[in-house]
Structures are given as structure tokens and as C-alpha cells.
Amino acid sequence: MDTQTNTAADSLAEILHALRGIRAPIQQGEYDLHDLVRASLAEAEIPCAHEVPLAPRCRIDLVCPGGIGIEIKRGQPDRKRIVMQLTRYAACGQISALILVTERTVAVPNRIHGKPISCVC
């Protein structure tokens, strides 16, 4: 594994570790979840950009160093729609990996366009 790949994998592991500690109160709005995720990343000293445009009409909730994109969904998202959305994001060159943060588990592929996909709920 080359150094760049190892660094991306390390960054992904660090971000996942920070996000797995989130415990969202019931009845949060989606932007409240955005705030919880951003606070968790800040506590772990992981910078992120919010509402990042990747392409025309294609904006992801957060992007962390190394091109790790985070999409946040409240409730039980529709699997077909979320996979289509993640597929659009994974097709963008600036994204190296994706993390889906949801309140409930959604079955998503492990990889899309060769990029790792993780789900945190």
C-alpha cells in the first residue's frame, strides 16, 4: 500500500472513530445532526468543510481532509435514493471515501466506483 493510500485509510479510520461516539437525542432535525457531527469532528481536531458543492446540483454535507465525504440523513432514508446519491458523490474526483451518518441502518454497498463506503448510525 502506498503512503497516500495509507494516509487516506488512516484518515478514514480516525473520522469513523470520532463519529461512532455520537449519540443523537430523539427528534433531532437534520441540521441538528449536522451540528453534532461537526462538533464530534472538532473535538477530535478533524477539520471539515460544510455543504461542499462537488458538481452542478451535487452538494455533500461535509468534506474532511483527504477527500472523505460525509452525508447525513435523519430518520430512515430510502435505500434506492441514498445509493443513487452516494453514487453521484463517488463519481466526483475530489471524493476518496464516503461515510453515511444515519439514525437507522441502511444497507449500502461497501464500495461505489472503487471508493469505500461506511455507514455510521
Which residue stretches match the model-derived regions?
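Acidic-basic catalytic patches of nuclease active cores, encompassing PD-(D/E)XK
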Residues: 2-53
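Surface-exposed alpha-helical segments enriched in charged/polar residues
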Residues: 17, 39, 84-91
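Amphipathic coiled-coil/heptad-repeat helices and related helical stalk/stem segments
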Residues: 55-56, 82-85
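Short glycine/proline-enriched coil/turn segments at helix->beta-strand junctions
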Residues: 42-46, 64-68, 92-96, 114-115
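Hydrophobic beta-strand residues in large extracellular and virion-surface proteins
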Residues: 37, 48, 70, 99-100
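Conserved catalytic cores of phosphodiester-cleaving nucleases, focusing on short active-site segments
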Residues: 62-76, 89
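Nucleic-acid nuclease catalytic cores
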Residues: 76-81, 90-121
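Catalytic centers of nucleases
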Residues: 53-65
